């Protein structure tokens, strides 16, 4: 999530910068992006990490650092003294939520309910936040790849309001 929920992530140059950050980090610390959505002030992602390296925190730190180094001068805002002393920028909040999907190997075959719940939560999130009426209308989402692969119908999530368990997305 961005610092003070600044709505900067969907600006075209920042979407490109995020893509570059992900590519750079994936080149150094392999992982697969199973699902992702970039919203104006936060990102949701579902990753598969190597069995021998489940360090998601380092990956997020590197992605955020890469992004911040490239654009921080545009977003210099008022930040706390403690953040200034730590060399932090006014782009990202310090914390993030994570959840380890149970048996992700089955999940990639779309059989694991925990995986599917998170996949659907991610792809429906732009609708949940009132940004679009249907997941297909949100440009910065892996939803389109899933439609191309025949996993989702293009109209999924368009006609009914989906409700998720209160703990999904808050891990």
Protein language model regions, located:
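Short catalytic/metal-binding and nucleic-acid-binding patches
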Residues: 1-171
């Amino acid at each position: 999530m961005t610092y003070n929920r600044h709505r900067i992530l969907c600006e075209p140059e920042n979407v490109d910068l995020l893509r570059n950050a992900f590519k750079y980090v994936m080149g150094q610390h392999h992982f697969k992006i199973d699902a992702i959505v970039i919203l104006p002030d936060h990102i949701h992602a579902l990753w598969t990490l190597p069995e021998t390296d489940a360090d998601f925190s380092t990956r997020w730190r590197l992605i955020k650092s890469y992004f911040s180094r490239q654009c921080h001068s545009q977003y210099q805002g008022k930040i706390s003294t403690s953040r200034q002393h730590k060399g932090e920028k006014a782009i990202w909040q310090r914390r993030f939520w994570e959840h380890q999907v149970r048996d992700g190997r089955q999940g990639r075959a779309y059989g694991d309910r925990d995986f599917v719940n998170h996949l659907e939560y991610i792809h429906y999130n732009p609708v949940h936040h009132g940004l679009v009426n249907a997941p297909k209308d949100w440009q910065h989402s892996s939803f389109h790849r899933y439609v191309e692969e025949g996993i989702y119908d293009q109209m999924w999530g368009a006609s009914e309001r989906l409700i998720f368990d209160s703990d999904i997305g808050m891990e």
